[in-house]
Amino acid sequence: MWIRPVSDRPNEELSPLERCYADAIEPAVLDVVELGLLEHRPHLHQRENWLIDPTRRWRRLGTLLAERAVLDRFVSPEAELWAGDSNSSHGISDRVTLEQAELSGESLRFICVLRAYLAVQLVNDSWKSRIAFEYGGVEYNLAVTDPTYNAPRDGLTRARVELGRTYLTVSLGEPFHGFCYKLVAAIVEAP
């Protein structure tokens, strides 16, 4: 079961203190985490939302190996990443209408692509990344929110890097001007 931990704040974002272990370290991608949950807080466009218990510290139980045999067990069945794609001014198949998101039933997918292209650039004094890939016969170019991949690689200030077999956690974001944007929340490069 996939969950999206949320807070009781109006935007439901987690504070740095709420999303770290007792030693103040934030979880890494592939960490297996135990956390306190108070109640299911679904939205029609994000049904995986669960309210965390802010009084309980998160605990790392272990880390999954970044190996195909392990990761493939968690891959979502191959299908398009939500029906009714449309393109924004910066992306390809990177958004769906709020109505389509509400009909989808899920807002988190863990997928595997054979090849992806990561583009990193400095925009208004902050690093922004997008990732382009093909999945289920559809081309995508999505914004990346994984902090590990929102920084320059190899000292370049603007880079386009080809990634081989890659696992992506794709999420539908909050509604914005009638659309929910598809975001890549985590990237795992397979060995």
Task: State each model region's role.
Residues 26-31, 36-114, 127-191:
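OB-fold/S1-family single-stranded nucleic acid-binding modules
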